[in-house]
């Protein structure tokens, strides 16, 4: 009987060790859980960025206002008869 109890105790200790410290144990679970959370956060940022880019593409495909806005902001172009005025911030 004593041998059986010692055997069960050793088996329980072995199972507990593998649960806490072994492959796919609690430590791996917590590490992977935090990695998944950070990846989900990164994915949310990328989804938002993709939605903005998709909206820009649709605006460029459907109308001239988006093209005109980009030409003004990125290339510094102006329409005929317009006067371009740039206000610079005061130096400190």
From Swiss-Prot:
One Pfam family recorded for the sequence: DivIC
Transmembrane segments: 4-21
Coiled-coil spans in chain: 40-73
Membrane topology label: Single-pass type II membrane protein
Residues in compartment: Cytoplasmic: 1-3
Protein localization: Cell inner membrane
Family: Belongs to the FtsB family.
HAMAP family: FtsB
Listed PANTHER family: CELL DIVISION PROTEIN FTSB
Protein name, as recorded: Cell division protein FtsB
Organism: Pseudoalteromonas translucida (strain TAC 125)
């Amino acid at each position: 009987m004593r041998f059986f109890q010692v055997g069960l105790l050793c088996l329980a200790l072995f199972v507990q060790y593998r649960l806490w410290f072994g492959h796919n144990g609690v430590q791996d679970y917590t590490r992977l859980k935090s990695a998944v959370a950070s990846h989900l956060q990164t994915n949310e940022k990328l989804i938002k960025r993709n939605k903005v880019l998709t909206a820009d593409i649709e605006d460029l495909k459907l109308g001239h206002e988006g093209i005109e806005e980009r030409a003004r902001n990125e290339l510094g172009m102006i329409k005929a008869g317009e006067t371009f005025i740039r206000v610079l911030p005061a130096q400190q």
